[in-house]
């Protein structure tokens, strides 16, 4: 019984720790599980893919990352 309680406590701690370490994205962006962020140089995200699918920041809507990693409309690139 003690080992079961210990496992439950460890599981709760792991969930809590995962939430603390959550990715913080810049203004006008959000976390997604897509490997291909859109940028001024690659507005469709076809050439900027990372090899591992993981949570990364992506600009919201029709915005793209500029060279300073700020989400801007494509017209401002």
From Swiss-Prot:
GO MF term set: serine-type endopeptidase inhibitor activity
Listed A to Z, the keywords are: Disulfide bond, Protease inhibitor, Secreted, Serine protease inhibitor, Signal
Disulfide bonds listed in the record: 25-57, 36-49, 40-77, 59-71
Localization annotation: Secreted
User: Which is a Pfam family this sequence falls into?
Assistant: TIL
Q: Which domain of life is it from?
A: Eukaryota
Tissue localization of expression is: Hemolymph.
| Cleavable signal peptide | 1-22
The UniProt site entry described as Reactive bond is assigned to 51-52
Instruction: Provide GO CC annotations from the record.
Output: extracellular region
Where primarily located? secreted
What family name appears in the similarity comment?
A: Belongs to the protease inhibitor I40 family.
Summary of the function given for this chain in its UniProt record = Highly specific for fungal protease and subtilisin.
| Protein name, as recorded | Fungal protease inhibitor F
């Amino acid at each position: 019984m003690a080992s079961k309680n210990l496992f439950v406590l460890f599981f709760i701690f792991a969930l809590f720790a995962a939430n603390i370490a959550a990715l913080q994205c810049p203004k006008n962006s959000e976390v997604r599980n897509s490997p291909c962020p859109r940028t001024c140089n690659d507005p469709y995200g076809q050439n900027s893919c990372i090899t591992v699918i993981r949570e990364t920041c992506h600009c919201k809507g029709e915005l793209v990352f500029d060279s300073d990693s700020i989400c801007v409309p494509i017209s401002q690139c």
